[in-house]
Amino acid sequence: MTQQTAQQEQQKSEVKIYSREELKQKTLAELQKIGKELGLTRTTGLKKEELIEKILKAQLEKSRLVFVKGVLEILPEGYGFLRMPENNYMPSWNDVYVAPSQIKKFGLRTGDTIEGFARLPRENEKYKALIRMESVNGLPPDPEILKRRPQFEKLTPLHPMERFKLEYDPNELSTRVVSLIAPIGKGQRGLIVAPPKAGKTVLLQKIAQAIIRNHPEVYLIILLIDERPEEVTEMRRIVKDKAEVVASTFDEPPERHMQVAEIVVEKAKRMVELKKDVVILMDSLTRFTRASNAVTPPTGRVLTGGIEITAFQRPKKFFGAARNIEEGGSLTIIATALVETGSKMDDVIYEEFKGTGNMEIHLDRRLMERRIFPAINIEKSGTRKEELLLEPWELQRIWVLRKFLSTMDPVEAMEFLLEKLRRFKTNEEFLKAMNA
């Protein structure tokens, strides 16, 4: 009986395992051949997608292995789990256990995107277990290659030097105004400072659409913390499959908010280590800090508004990860900060983050009340070191424009700028026409 069991295990291990992506790349004839090898009786007359599903199911029955893809979270105990994007990287029954020996052998880190094969749970086990890795962040699972990866914290941070093109529609004035008043570069650490109902979420959506349209090389993550579920659905429908939307809604506990945000930024860091450009649009940094305050053990050192001094450590580590990297790659974080909510804590949170960013967009309640969108306060908004992002002739004209607009009331200034922008299809045309 033991010999027979051993033979069965050997036969299982000899079954060639295909991932869903590998099967999608094969022709229908090749899929039919694979199906026959797996013992499928009916392979003709099926659509390609139907045949792929049958092959995956047959593979699972024969080998007891299943193809998995997730983001690694290493726990303090030394082992880890692959968290699934469809579950917003939250712990779930669908997670895959990763042994400490695998983590140590391959030099794996929290945030690594791993593809591979896992076996189903045995008796008295709760989770699938990772058996074989196919790739780590798109790299082959070679311990020598993976252990030579640079560490994000040791890379050289620089000021942003390459500007994001945010103009994608002549009639979309929100992103055109941002391009003029507070240009965003690769590696920017920006705050959108907004009172309630001033249009911060809509502005984030417009920025997301601009990046998707003009910068397909960028990996875009939209992180929604403590937001309403319907806003999550709306954002997913706007960006479709062009960006990753990760959310922890207001009905989740603060621990979940922290865990989701931290695994997202670790995933972004692993991509930047491979010289990729990543953008995180976060709504909101204020609620993330509130969640941090809720999970921080009380120390007795409390600021005005009831927030622990140590509650800022994790949000600052998150926000401070944004940087342009000299060796290649960048991590851009644009986060919203709430003000004028009636909560002293929110004002203290904004004051604490005020000097940490290198770009700020201030939304103004007065413009919002007059239904002027974008409700941007031009005088208060701007980008540090904007001369690195703009052409010299653009910079000179924008300075002249700002000087002229500073003599006006914020409402008049925005109305004037919008009226002028509507006359031209692009910002370049508008700036060149300023001579006349």
From Swiss-Prot:
Q: Which GO terms describe its molecular function?
A: ATP binding; ATP hydrolysis activity; ATP-dependent activity, acting on RNA; helicase activity; RNA binding
Residues the entry annotates as binding ATP: G185, K186, G187, Q188, R189, G190, K197, A198, G199, K200, T201, V202, R228
Q: What is its EC number?
A: 3.6.4.-
Coiled-coil ranges (or none): none
| Domain Rho RNA-BD as annotated: residue spans | 65-140
The text of the family note is: Belongs to the Rho family.
Q: What does this protein do?
A: Facilitates transcription termination by a mechanism that involves Rho binding to the nascent RNA, activation of Rho's RNA-dependent ATPase activity, and release of the mRNA from the DNA template.
Q: What is this protein called?
A: Transcription termination factor Rho
Q: Which organism is it from?
A: Aquifex aeolicus (strain VF5)
What does the organism's lineage look like at the top?
A: Bacteria, Pseudomonadati, Aquificota, Aquificia, Aquificales
